[in-house]
From Swiss-Prot:
Chain intervals for the UniProt region annotation (Involved in fusion and/or binding to host membrane): 98-104, 184-191
Glycosylation sites: N155, N247, N286, N329, N361, N486
Matching InterPro entries: Glycoprot_B_PH1, Glycoprot_B_PH2, Glycoprot_B_PH2_sf, Glycoprotein_B_ecto_C, Herpes_Glycoprot_B
Protein name, per record: Envelope glycoprotein B
Membrane spanning residue stretches: 689-709
């Protein structure tokens, strides 16, 4: 480190001297490129140690594959399920319970019972597209009940018609679109009967080994669809529920009713399971199911023979199929079903592609690949070879007829050997090329190892493809990364003569490399002195000198320019492209390998994968939603708005037992009657007559309110006239009340304006009230006496008998019945 510090100090002092004695005309701008930028390469203490690996072994290439031409057909395992049609038959009984009120019928409850249709009725469906309107229900105790459609007690035939809601896989036929709904007696519960025959044309799927099959409606039958009762196929359903008929005639499609086309079924099975009867055609398994399916045909293929296997190569599929050398014999009937198909394919491919130039080299062979694919291989041979072979045989026949067959075989073997030799020669050439390349690489590494002892940095930089500083430390290389300087600050001096401390250029000593000045990146703008090295490497210091050689011409490369120094002075700069290149690179002229775009091989298409599942969830959900929509439409047509209190009270009272049920009937009748009354009033108010009547009543109420208001206002304004109307009578009238005579005389005004009132006679015990009041002033005692007199007068008028009182005194009808035989007594007599 001390030596490095001294070196940098010397460089700094020299740079200071040069800056004093040099001006801008003494240097030029140096060029650079991106591959070799201006850099300082020095070896630090912490470096990486590297070495060349010369222990490389090159194995010779050897191929033991034998190629032959032909084409092949590939079959895959058929994963699709066995699909067949199934019909289901069901009788659906509906018992709706209703309650009838005045003008409305409430739907309370509905009981649905499903029954499997008997076989004899299914025969009627299959032959005439009809079913019966009566159903026999057998209880576990042996009791048989009969139910009739619409409670008509008649067994008739009903026509089947398609349901509006259907899916792709299912078609449903019914006899009753809207369930029968009877209107019972008023204020009583009633139950009616409705029969609906439901026939569904569904699709069933079974998967190998065919131990069960599932319908698209979601129903399952635990048994083989190929079971005929005696062939030993798996069947787990009760055999007493299974009926097998032979030579059965049935309507093929129920869409046209009894006019539909009929078909003859060799064997048909009827299975009663739960509330459904199933029927399907029984077929032979070997005739209906094939376990193999054609996948693809490779019209141009190669077969490479190795020690233990065959490799079937397809350029079209960019794939190779590996199979063992043992060929197969397809004996299973589920596999021999493909024989006619692939023999036809072999004939068609040969006639269309190979008939002109090739001949079949023997019969086809069947192999099983490692991916469980069945491969049928058809070898081919060129006709030109066959013609040559036949010509040689014919020539031999003229000379020697005894040894024809042996020479024919020898000639064929020779021709095949020639083909194999050419093939092996090409393969060996490629192998030798690979081995030679390996040996050349080994020798190149050895040469680089030796050259690294002379110029380690150059060798390592070429190996890594970027500037690297390297130094040989014994038997290993120490490498480090070079430090890049500020590229724009590098300046190349025009003079290569040595300058002493006084600034005088020497005539005898010169620099062997041009001087440059530069600065570091992201540092102070101090200029550092160095010398230009190879590939734009900057060598620190200026101690690399030599004796001047006059005359001399030296060219130094910097970036994309070549700087020419004549007699150690820069004369000009030329582009590096003007200097001719010494081409020492030996190019390998070989065509590149043809592009191979790999194809995505779909062994099974999405449609096949979907058909491989026995349970098709999508179709089952579609069927469920379609049937649910149909039921919703039917229920919407028969359902009515039932008051919530009716169902609530009915459910509560049903929990109380028989007493609660009876009490609930009474309460329901009463509540229904009250509800009808309230509903009648509301309905009356809703019609035009009721609305007009209510408007008239409202007007009458308003008029009454106005009259009462006016009368009340009149009372407030004239209380005496309203409270004592008799006070307005003439004073000349004489009233006798209870033996009292009151004589009223007209009032006479005196001179003072007063009024004199004279009372002639009063009842015994009463004081005479008379006097003359003058003026407008009355004392409180006078006012009190006047009020008492008014009160007495009012009471006398109120005690006067009237016609209404005499009428009210008559006994009522109830009193006369109650007190019959008695006679009323007069009050005076009493």
């Amino acid at each position: 480190m001390s030596k490095m510090r001294v070196l940098f100090l010397a460089v700094f002092l020299m740079n200071s001297v040069l800056m004093i004695y040099c001006d801008s005309d003494d240097y030029i701008r140096a060029g650079y490129n991106h591959k070799y930028p201006f850099r300082i390469c020095s070896i630090a203490k912490g470096t990486d140690l590297m070495r060349f690996d010369r222990d490389i072994s090159c194995s010779p290439y050897k191929s033991n594959a034998k190629m032959s031409e032909g084409f092949f057909i590939i079959y895959k395992t058929n994963i699709e399920t066995y699909t067949f049609p199934v019909r289901t038959y069901k009788n659906e009984l509906t018992f709706p319970t209703s309650y009838r009120d005045v003008g409305v019928v409430y739907f309370l409850d509905r009981t649905v019972m499903g029954l499997a249709m008997p076989v004899y009725e299914a025969n009627l469906v299959n032959s005439r597209a009809q079913c019966y309107s009566a159903v026999a229900i057998k209880r576990p105790d042996g009791t048989v009940f009969s139910a009739y459609h619409e409670d008509n007690n008649k067994n008739e035939t009903l026509e089947l018609f398609p349901l509006n809601f259907k899916s792709v896989t299912n078609k449903r036929f019914i006899t009753t679109k809207e369930p029968y709904f009877a209107r019972g007696p008023l204020w009583l519960y009633s139950t009616s009967t409705s029969l609906n025959c439901i026939v569904t044309e569904a699709t069933a799927k079974a998967k190998y080994p065919f131990s069960y099959f599932a319908l698209t409606t979601g129903e399952i039958v635990e048994g083989s669809p190929f079971f005929d009762g005696s062939n030993g196929k798996h069947f787990a359903e009760p055999l007493e529920k299974l009926t097998i008929l032979e030579n059965y005639t049935m309507i093929e499609d129920l869409m046209n009713g009894m006019n539909g086309a009929t078909t003859l079924v060799r064997k048909i099975a009827f299975l009663e399971k739960g509330d459904t009867l199933f029927s399907w055609e029984i077929k032979e398994e070997n005739e209906s199911v094939c376990m193999l399916k054609h996948w693809t045909t490779v019209t141009h293929g190669l077969r490479a023979e190795t020690d233990e296997t065959y490799h079937f190569i397809s350029k079209e599929l960019t794939a190779a199929f590996v199979a063992s050398k043992e060929s197969l014999n397809l004996t299973d009937p589920k596999q021999t079903c493909i024989k006619n198909e692939f023999e036809k394919i072999i004939t068609d491919v040969y006639m269309s592609d190979y008939n002109d130039a090739y001949s079949m080299n023997g019969s086809y062979q069947i192999f099983k690949t490692t991916g469980d694919l069945i491969l049928i291989w058809q070898p081919l041979v060129q006709k030109s070879l066959m013609v040559l072979e036949q010509g040689s045989v014919n020539l031999r026949r003229r000379r020697d007829l005894v040894d024809v067959k042996s020479r024919h075989d020898i000639l064929y073997v020779q021709l095949q050997y020639l083909y194999d030799t050419l093939k092996d020669y090409i393969n060996d050439a490629l192998g030798n090329l690979a081995e030679s390349w390996c040996l050349d690489q080994k020798r190149t590494i050895t040469m680089l190892h030796e050259l690294s002892k002379i110029s380690p940095s150059s060798i390592v930089s070429e190996v890594y493809g970027r500037p690297i500083s390297a130094q040989l430390h014994g038997d290993v290389l120490a490498i480090s990364k070079c430090i890049e300087v500020n590229q724009s600050s590098v300046q190349l001096y025009k003079s290569m003569r040595v300058v002493d401390a006084k600034g005088v250029r020497s005539e005898t000593m010169c620099y062997n490399r041009p001087l440059v000045t530069f600065s570091f990146v992201n540092s102070t703008p101090e200029v550092v002195l160095g010398q230009l090295g190879l590939d734009n490497e900057i060598l620190l210091g200026d101690h690399r000198t030599e004796e001047c050689e006059i005359p001399s011409t030296k060219i130094f490369l910097s970036g994309n320019h070549a700087h020419v120094y004549t007699d150690y002075t820069h004369t000009n700069s030329t582009p590096i492209e003007d200097i001719e290149v010494l081409d020492a690179f030996i190019r390998l002229k070989i065509d590149p390998l043809e592009n191979a775009d790999f194809k995505l091989l779909d062994l099974y298409s999405p449609d096949e994968l979907s058909r491989a599942n026995v349970f098709d969830l999508e179709n089952i959900l579609r069927e469920y939603n379609s049937y649910k929509s149909a039921l919703y439409t039917i229920e919407a047509k028969i359902a009515t708005n039932t008051p919530s209190y009716v169902n609530g009270i009915n459910s509560f009272l049903q929990g109380l037992g028989a007493i609660g049920t009876g009490l609930g009937s009474v309460i329901s009748v009463t509540a229904g009657a009250l509800g009808d009354i309230v509903g009648g009033v509301v309905s009356f108010l809703k019609n035009p007559f009721g609305g007009g009547l209510m408007l008239i009543l409202a007007i009458v109420v308003v008029v009454i309110i106005i009259v009462v208001f006016v009368r009340q206002k009149h009372v407030l304004s004239k209380p005496i006239d309203m409270m004592f109307p008799y006070a307005t009578n003439p004073v000349t009238t004489v009233s006798s009340v209870t033996g009292t005579t009151v004589v009223k005389t007209p009032s006479v005004k005196d001179a003072d304006g007063g009024t004199s009132v004279a009372v002639s006679e009063k009842e015994e015990g009463m004081a005479d009230v008379s006097g003359q009041i003058s003026g407008d002033e009355y004392s409180q005692e006078d006012a009190l006496k006047m009020l008492k007199a008014i009160k007495s007068l009012d009471e006398s008028y109120r005690r006067k008998p009237s016609s209404s009182e005499s009428h009210a005194s008559k006994p009522s009808l109830i009193d006369r019945i109650r007190y019959r035989g008695y006679k009323s007594v007069n009050v005076e007599e009493a």
